[in-house]
C-alpha cells in the first residue's frame, strides 16, 4: 500500500500533474503499473481520509499547547514509530514545521498504513503528504521538502 502512495505522490501530486483524474482510470493505471488491487484500494482510501482533513470533514484533535507538556506515545504508536521517528517528529515541532494538530494527523495517518515495516524515510514522506493536503501549510511543506531532499542528496555523494 505504501508503494502505491509513493507512486501516486511522485507521479500525480509532487510533479503537479493533472490532479483531477478519473478514479477508474487511475485504478487501471495503477493495475497496469503492477500494483495489487487491494493495495490500490487501501491507498485510495488512505488518501480519501487524508483529504477529509483538507475539506474539514475530519477535525484534528484539539490540544492544549503548554510548552512544558510532552507527547506520550501509546504502545501501538511506539511499535510503528521507533525512537528515531518520534525524535524526528519532536524536532519538526521544535523548528515549527509541525504544530500539535498536524503532528496528530501525521501519527493517525501513519497508524492507518497497512504496512509491516516503517522507518524514518517513510515517515518523512507521510509528513510531506499530510502537509501537502493542508491549506496554509505551504511554508511547512517547503521546509519539509528541503529537509527530505537535502538529506537524500547528501547521501548520494
UniProtKB/Swiss-Prot annotation:
Organism: Shigella boydii serotype 18 (strain CDC 3083-94 / BS512)
Domain of life of the organism encoding this protein: Bacteria
Organism lineage string: Bacteria, Pseudomonadati, Pseudomonadota, Gammaproteobacteria, Enterobacterales
Recorded family membership: Belongs to the Smg family.
Name the record gives this protein: Protein Smg
PANTHER family, alphabetized: PROTEIN SMG (PTHR38692:SF1)
HAMAP family per the UniProt record, alphabetical: Smg
